[in-house]
Regions:
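Acidic, metal-coordinating catalytic segment for phosphate/diphosphate chemistry
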Residues: 87-130
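Conserved acyl-CoA
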Residues: 64-72, 182
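Unchanged
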Residues: 129, 134-136, 146, 163-305
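N-terminal strand-loop-strand
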Residues: 112, 116-160, 186-187, 191-194
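Conserved beta-strand-loop-alpha-helix junction that forms the acyl-donor binding cleft
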Residues: 78-86, 146, 165
Length: 337
């Protein structure tokens, strides 16, 4: 899951860009260069601590890199504004590479481990895949990640294999690759069930497109990608759906249900060739995230009805999402043709 890791690692860059590189009222440059940990085992160098002196920066950066490497840290991120331009050559000398740049800053990164880098490439859009692999015994292939937000959800948090699509890579190829990289299971791609659109994500707060795919297992033995995956199992579908992984009627709850129901309706593998059902347009379902404020559009051939019955909290979240959408539409400027 080297590339899958980049989906999570991209959030590191987002955190870097969101972090203020200078503090109001603070002096430009402190006595000691320092950094703060990110959620993926890396370091964000705090620009407010950059020494004014190039010599001091050279000495302190070398010391910190040695310390961080010994501590098992991964990517080290450094953002330089124009006033820090004199430090650029020193950063190069210590092995930093430019990740991306704009008019306000240059972002550099250095990968410390001896293993292949999982640092994401700069992007205009992110395209990711999640793969629902369900076998004839109604078991779904799920994983636990070692790093990233999912790893912080607890020991009983399981998810489908996921990851970023490489530049020039088809969705089908990416889905097959991600499952094999994370679990060692070979699969046959069967199609796209839905896709989610999320804005202000990743490196430059770009739009993220996440495609929920369906795949059929061609093997069952699991071989973990130990660098990124803590565990992987074939879990009974009923057990997976019964776990309180996501609030009911939230975006990710809906995608899990969609994958399960698509498998059941397909009736498993059928002999011979056949046409699919009558083509149906993917329609947008605006659903609350559930785990934090906000909502996403989930595009699928099925619609998610408003929560009914005893789902008062889910109904409230759903209504809030619809209200926020309506307010945004009213505030949007009218196009002039």
């Amino acid at each position: 899951m080297m590339r899958a890791a980049t989906a999570a690692t991209a959030a590191t860059v987002a955190a870097l860009l969101a972090h203020e590189t200078s503090c109001a009222g603070a002096a430009d440059g402190q006595d000691e260069l320092s950094g703060k940990p990110d959620m993926f085992g890396g370091i964000l160098i705090e620009a407010r601590t950059l020494p004014k002196s190039g010599k001091a920066f050279d000495e302190q950066l070398g010391e910190r890199l040695s310390q961080w490497k010994a501590a098992g840290k991964k990517g080290v991120w450094l953002k330089l504004k124009p006033e820090h331009a004199t430090l650029l050559a020193t950063a190069y000398a210590h092995g930093f590479e430019i990740h991306h740049a704009n008019k306000q800053h240059i972002v550099l990164v250095k990968w410390l481990p001896e293993t292949p880098s999982t640092i994401p490439q700069p992007a205009s859009h992110y395209v990711g895949v999640g793969i629902a692999v369900i076998d004839k015994n109604n078991r779904i292939l799920v994983v636990q990640e070692k790093f990233g937000p999912a790893s912080r959800r607890g020991r009983d948090f399981w998810k489908m294999p996921t990851g970023l699509v490489d530049n020039g890579e088809d969705l089908e190829t990416a889905a097959v690759r991600e499952v094999f990289e994370e679990t060692g299971v070979r699969v046959a791609f069967e199609g796209v069930l839905a896709f989610r659109q999320q804005h202000q994500s990743g490196v430059e707060q770009k739009t993220d497109l996440f495609f929920l795919c369906k795949a059929r297992p061609l093997s069952s033995d699991i071989t973990l990608q130990e660098a990124e995956i803590a565990n992987a199992v074939w879990m009974p579908l009923s057990e997976y759906l019964s776990k309180p992984l996501w609030p009911e009627f939230s975006a990710y709850w809906w995608m899990s249900r969609l994958a399960a129901e698509a498998h059941v309706e397909a009736g498993g593998d059928l002999p011979g060739g056949r046409l699919g059902s009558r083509p149906t347009a993917f329609v947008p379902n605006l659903l609350p995230l559930g785990s934090r404020p906000g909502a996403n559009y989930i595009y699928s051939a099925a619609t998610c009805p408003p929560p009914q019955g005893d789902h008062a909290k889910a109904r409230a979240r759903w209504e809030q999402a619809q209200a926020e959408l309506k307010a945004a539409q009213q505030q949007a400027p009218t196009s002039k043709l």
